[in-house]
UniProtKB/Swiss-Prot annotation:
This is GTPase Era. GTP binds at residues 10-17, 57-61, 119-122. An essential GTPase that binds both GDP and GTP, with rapid nucleotide exchange. Plays a role in 16S rRNA processing and 30S ribosomal subunit biogenesis and possibly also in cell cycle regulation and energy metabolism. One of its GO terms (cellular component) is plasma membrane. InterPro entries: G_ERA_dom (IPR030388), GTP-bd (IPR006073), GTPase_Era-like (IPR005662), KH_dom-like_a/b (IPR015946), KH_dom_type_2 (IPR004044), KH_sf_prok-type (IPR009019), P-loop_NTPase (IPR027417), Small_GTP-bd (IPR005225). Its main location: cytoplasm.
Length: 290
């Protein structure tokens, strides 16, 4: 029986969360075309007769001096210190850039075993030649490279085999039926945030967060009251929408997803609140990103 921890690293929107959800077979990490949707270290657990893999999905690696981004980068570095293996995922639709150089530098300095995953091989018009040349120049051995499609589950079985090859004998860290260790409040707040991101302009998702005010199980149904906080007054109108159209859409789609995941009826009530410049408050950022 083998077991261990594997961190998923990569630039924003490379398919890290999709890979986590695909292999674990459940919606664990929220997904959006908006870069850096993932803020926290999200654990996904895969168990079979060979052992157990605990994946840690990390925020997208992005070089920026904004407080929020710096906090997320600290998250990535702390994740690396917790694992036996790093899965570095590259979107083959994009040319290698400054982030690729920095990520490989961090990985090599860590002395931790790693695999490079070339994701989205099911798509056309890729930069596979440029990426292959880049990895060759960085002296990455072919044995450490796997071509995959996280969405289409291409070569994910080969990936699991490779991961187990890099793990040592060990116990199961979680019961077999577990697929994540996230608390229900966090999962629900992330689902609401995901649905808000799907509706809104690109710049707005970075200025909102969700807090669960009330979460109760009443006669077999979830009763949830949640607050969506924004950083300035104008953003409230964007989220609420004309005659409440946007917030109603966010709430309805979040309710459907919550009911499906937790296999129960769900009553969800959302309210939009202003917390001016919250994304510049160190204490709040630290609480939200962990």
């Amino acid at each position: 029986m083998k077991s261990g921890f594997a961190a998923i690293l990569g630039r924003p929107s490379t398919g890290k969360s999709t890979l986590l959800n695909s292999i674990c077979g459940h919606k664990i990490s929220i997904i959006s075309p908006i870069p850096q949707t993932t803020r926290n270290k999200i654990k996904g657990i895969f168990t079979d007769d060979r052992g157990q893999i605990i994946f840690i999905d990390t925020p997208g690696f992005h070089l920026s001096k904004k407080k929020f981004n710096i906090a997320m980068m600290k998250n990535i570095h702390s994740s690396i210190g917790e694992v036996e293996l790093i899965l570095y995922i590259i979107d083959i639709q994009d040319k290698p850039g400054e982030e690729e150089n920095k990520i490989l530098e961090i990985i090599k300095n860590s002395k931790i075993k790693f695999l490079v995953l070339l994701n989205k091989v099911d798509l056309k018009n890729t930069k596979i030649k440029e990426i292959t040349q880049f990895l060759k120049e960085k002296e990455i051995e072919d044995n450490n490279i796997i071509k995959i499609s996280a969405e289409k589950k291409i070569n994910t079985e080969e990936l699991k085999n490779k991961i187990y090859e890099n793990f040592s004998e060990g116990p199961l860290y979680y019961p077999q039926e577990y697929y994540t260790d996230q608390e229900i409040n966090f999962r629900i707040s992330e689902i609401i945030r995901e649905k808000a991101i799907e509706n809104l302009k690109e710049e707005l998702p970075y200025s909102l967060y969700v807090d669960i005010d009330i979460l109760e199980n009443k006669k077999g149904s979830l009763f949830i009251r949640a607050n969506i906080f924004v950083a300035n007054e104008s953003q409230k109108g964007i989220i609420v929408g004309k005659n409440g159209k946007e917030i109603k859409s966010i709430g309805e789609r979040a309710r459907i997803t919550i009911a499906k995941i937790f296999e129960t009826k769900c009553n969800l009530f959302l309210q939009v609140k202003l917390k001016k410049n919250w994304n510049k408050e160190d204490k709040l950022i630290k609480r939200l990103i962990n």
